[in-house]
């Protein structure tokens, strides 16, 4: 495999995520003592502890020095600066984030987390990214659309909406679902022939494709609509209000567009014009 920018980030994140989970991560903030019993932060500290999973470039990953970085972290920093609080980031496994949030180990989650009515006891911010799901396959694959997944093995990251879609395919007798720990592992599994396709967030796939179009490709139309939000505990409406206010200001003052450009992401017009909120309301109404 070619040693290029994004694969270096992916492999670095894959090797280091276990270490990060154990020691608090490359970012000094990850080892903050603010994560106290019953509440990750206190009113007097003015610090919000944010859980993330740095295996998801360009939204959260590790740089060449092992520090956590990415669009979500920069966005959270911008929101915090606008609203007058500080943030500290804590690395953990993706499927442990909601549990950590509801037990007070962290105050918020910024980890490319999709709006999902099955996520209980939490509140989502307004959407900040249109991240529809797509199908990634090997560059020489003859899979051209979802219709071609019959009898195939389809991978996805455990705990994600992609995993829900893969599981639904298996339950329908269409394909075999293979749920793996993170997207890096899914990509490696695809490249080594362990699966035939990945259901993956399109912006993440596009970031990988920039340097690896000779290895993989996105195929067919977007598989399903998906949006990201920042997540807080259901009892923390005050923090949610600050996050939403800060997000609106960051979008309005142009900082949001700057961050999209920095991480080579398409500016999500549905977020800027408000139509993403309507789409999310429809998604979340499925729980009612």
How should each PLM-predicted stretch be described?
Residues 25, 164-180, 217-219, 248-288:
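Ligand-binding clefts/hinges and TM-proximal coupling segments of bilobed small-molecule sensing domains
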């Amino acid at each position: 495999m070619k040693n290029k920018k994004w694969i270096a980030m992916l492999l670095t994140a894959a090797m280091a995520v276990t270490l990060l989970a154990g020691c608090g991560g490359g970012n000094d903030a990850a080892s903050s003592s603010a994560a106290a019993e019953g509440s990750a932060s206190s009113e007097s500290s003015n610090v919000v502890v944010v859980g993330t999973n740095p295996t998801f470039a360009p939204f959260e990953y590790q740089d060449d020095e092992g520090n956590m970085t990415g669009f979500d972290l920069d966005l959270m920093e911008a929101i915090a600066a606008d609203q007058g609080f500080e943030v500290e980031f804590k690395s953990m496994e993706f499927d442990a984030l909601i549990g950590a949030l509801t037990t007070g180990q962290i105050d918020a989650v910024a980890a490319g987390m999709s709006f999902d009515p099955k996520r209980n006891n939490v509140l989502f911010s307004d959407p900040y990214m249109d991240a529809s799901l797509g199908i990634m396959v090997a560059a020489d694959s003859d899979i051209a659309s979802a219709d071609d997944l019959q009898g195939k093995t389809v991978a996805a990251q455990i705990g994600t909406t992609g995993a829900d879609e893969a599981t639904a395919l298996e339950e329908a007798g269409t394909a075999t679902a293979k749920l793996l720990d993170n997207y890096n592992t899914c990509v490696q599994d695809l490249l080594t022939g362990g699966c035939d396709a990945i259901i993956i967030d399109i912006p993440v796939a596009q970031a990988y494709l920039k340097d690896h179009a000779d290895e993989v490709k996105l195929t067919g139309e977007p598989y399903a609509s998906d949006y990201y939000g920042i997540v807080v505990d259901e009892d923390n409406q005050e923090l949610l209000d600050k996050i939403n206010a800060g997000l609106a200001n960051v979008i309005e003052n142009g900082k949001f567009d700057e961050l999209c450009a920095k991480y080579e992401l398409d500016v999500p017009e549905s977020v800027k014009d408000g139509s993403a909120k309507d789409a999310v309301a429809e998604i979340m109404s499925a729980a009612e």
